[in-house]
């Protein structure tokens, strides 16, 4: 999935959570079949932690794959 598609999908997942351009670039490494699950995981983690912007540091800190 390309960066622009990821950016659109990620930033429409929740109106209160924004994904940075760098975070969306990092998400290009996620296989297409797992993209919705990855975005939903990050949105839920952001909500749980009171975060409104998902950046690369947040992705790394909350990566369920370690």
For each feature predicted by the language model, list its residue ranges.
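Non-catalytic accessory segments flanking P-loop/AAA+ NTPase cores
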Residues: 1-66
